[in-house]
Swiss-Prot record:
<comment type="function">
    <text>Produces ATP from ADP in the presence of a proton gradient across the membrane.</text>
</comment>
<dbReference type="InterPro" id="IPR001469">
    <property type="entry name" value="ATP_synth_F1_dsu/esu"/>
</dbReference>
<dbReference type="InterPro" id="IPR020547">
    <property type="entry name" value="ATP_synth_F1_esu_C"/>
</dbReference>
<keyword id="KW-0406">Ion transport</keyword>
<dbReference type="Pfam" id="PF02823">
    <property type="entry name" value="ATP-synt_DE_N"/>
</dbReference>
<keyword id="KW-0066">ATP synthesis</keyword>
<dbReference type="Pfam" id="PF00401">
    <property type="entry name" value="ATP-synt_DE"/>
</dbReference>
<keyword id="KW-0139">CF(1)</keyword>
<dbReference type="GO" id="GO:0005524">
    <property type="term" value="F:ATP binding"/>
</dbReference>
<keyword id="KW-0793">Thylakoid</keyword>
<dbReference type="InterPro" id="IPR036771">
    <property type="entry name" value="ATPsynth_dsu/esu_N"/>
</dbReference>
<keyword id="KW-0472">Membrane</keyword>
<comment type="similarity">
    <text>Belongs to the ATPase epsilon chain family.</text>
</comment>
<keyword id="KW-0375">Hydrogen ion transport</keyword>
<comment type="subunit">
    <text>F-type ATPases have 2 components, CF(1) - the catalytic core - and CF(0) - the membrane proton channel. CF(1) has five subunits: alpha(3), beta(3), gamma(1), delta(1), epsilon(1). CF(0) has three main subunits: a, b and c.</text>
</comment>
<protein>
    <recommendedName>
        <fullName>ATP synthase epsilon chain</fullName>
    </recommendedName>
</protein>
<dbReference type="GO" id="GO:0046933">
    <property type="term" value="F:proton-transporting ATP synthase activity, rotational mechanism"/>
</dbReference>
Length: 138
């Protein structure tokens, strides 16, 4: 049996299809969803959502939000999302490396606001690079 999956951002629908399995980057860790899953509402971290519509997996970089699971349907409402297959892997790698360098630089200082901003930028860059297949998803 399949699950209907919808990934929605404020400006578009990123995914609207059925899947056999979904893995969400929830605030408490990776959360696997199969057909018949109990109703659930969970917060999502910045990370990679994995969808298996058939035998292959699709990656989606998600930028935080919520997911609701009910009656074999998953609604994912996120601040931003991008299909891994649409992300340029080399550009994502360069963005990730720049974000890592920036985080290393600001972490040495004592400006908490800049450190938090650099951490968020690094998380977003890591999610995009992972979704593109550049890093092993955790």
């Amino acid at each position: 049996m399949s699950i209907t999956v919808r990934v929605i951002t404020p400006d578009r629908i990123v995914w609207d299809n059925v899947a056999e399995e979904v893995i969400l980057p929830s605030s408490t860790g990776q959360l696997g969803i199969l057909s018949g899953h109990a109703p659930l509402l969970t917060a999502l971290n910045i990370g990679v959502m994995r969808i298996r519509p058939g035998k292959d997996w699709e990656n989606i970089a998600v930028l935080g939000g919520f997911a609701e699971v009910e009656n074999n349907e998953i609604k994912v409402l996120v601040n931003g999302a991008e299909l891994g297959s649409k992300i340029d892997k080399e550009k994502a790698r360069a963005e990730y490396e720049r974000a890592q360098t920036r985080l290393d630089e600001v972490s040495k200082g004592d400006d908490r606001r800049k450190t938090i901003q650099a951490q968020q930028s690094w998380r977003k860059a890591r999610a995009r690079y992972q979704a593109a297949g550049g890093l092993v998803s955790v």
